[in-house]
A protein has these predicted regions:
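Intrinsic-disorder/low-complexity, polar/charged segments enriched in Ser/Thr/Lys/Arg/Asp/Glu/Gln
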Residues: 1, 29-33, 65-67
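Compositionally biased, disordered extreme N-termini, encompassing classical targeting presequences
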Residues: 1-2, 74
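Amphipathic, hydrophobic secondary-structure cores in small proteins
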Residues: 6-58
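C-terminal edge-of-domain segments
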Residues: 57-74
Length: 74
């Protein structure tokens, strides 16, 4: 089980900033689950995290959110 960060209702770019801060707290290779609203957050946050070099995988979609798994890279 890995930590979960619920960012539903958080606007861009704050949801990306909060995700990055949480990633800074975990070790390289560790995982973080992030819940994001559909729309812009669902598109922008994973894209930005991938550009930072992290591995991002969509775990599933809820009625009002998407769940992603982020593996921290160095």
């Amino acid at each position: 089980m890995f930590p979960t960060l619920d960012l539903r209702g958080t606007s861009c770019p704050l949801n990306y900033v909060r995700t990055r801060l949480e990633l800074d707290r975990i070790g390289v290779g560790e995982e973080l689950e992030v819940w994001l609203d559909h729309g812009e957050p669902e598109e922008q946050v994973p894209r930005s995290l991938r550009m930072d070099g992290h591995h991002v995988e969509v775990l599933g979609h809820g009625d009002d959110h998407v769940r992603i798994r982020v593996v921290r890279r160095g």
